[in-house]
């Protein structure tokens, strides 16, 4: 949104003021600058337009199986609120995506997060692999490491990362070989 673009530019200007030259001659952010950078990253992760774009891009897959949606561990700003008015009542991105896919698009979806027990996640993985009762998993960071679900064919990544390990892990979830899977698709927002 325009408000998000303005806030992004403002955070960027503030970060520029927080650059300092290190002993090695390279520039780095001060602690204050790092906090501003985190705010800017959260703003990008929770951008409202990502939800609109997801709805548009996922429509051709509405009846498919083995879909994965990675969400940011962030809240999405209500377009009618000011950026300074964010509070605990704002919805988490994962909840908005779950509502969009499950209620609006009538898809069979489930969240796959640290809130689900180990046993619940095992059941979700089995159901997802079968594809009969579960079309899509909606996750935050729970699938970053140590989870093997090779049947994932299509991923929608709303939470990109600059961490190389996380970047590779998230794509690796989709790019694994699986019986009957000839290719994989990744949409990175």
Question: What feature does the model see in each segment?
Answer:
Residues 68, 90-144:
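Conserved helicase ATPase core of P-loop NTP-dependent helicases/translocases
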Residues 4, 74-76, 117, 143-144, ...:
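Conserved nucleotide-binding/hydrolysis micro-motifs of P-loop NTPases
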């Amino acid at each position: 949104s325009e408000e998000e673009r303005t806030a992004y530019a403002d955070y960027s200007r503030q970060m520029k003021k927080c650059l300092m030259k290190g002993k090695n001659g390279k520039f780095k952010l001060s602690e204050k600058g790092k906090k501003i950078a985190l705010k800017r990253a959260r703003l990008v992760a929770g951008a409202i337009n990502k939800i609109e774009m997801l709805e548009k891009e996922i429509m051709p897959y509405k009846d498919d199986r083995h879909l994965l949606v990675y969400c940011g561990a962030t809240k999405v700003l209500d377009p009618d609120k000011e950026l300074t008015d964010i509070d605990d009542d704002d919805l988490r991105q994962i909840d908005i995506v779950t509502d969009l896919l499950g209620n609006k698009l009538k898809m069979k979806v489930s969240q796959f997060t640290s809130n689900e027990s180990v046993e619940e996640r095992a059941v979700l993985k089995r159901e997802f692999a079968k594809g009969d009762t579960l079309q899509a998993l909606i996750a935050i960071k729970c699938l970053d490491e140590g989870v093997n679900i090779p049947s994932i064919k299509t991923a929608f990544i709303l939470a990109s990362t600059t961490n190389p390990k996380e970047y590779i892990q998230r794509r690796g979830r989709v790019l694994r070989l699986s019986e009957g899977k000839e290719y994989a698709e990744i949409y990175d927002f």
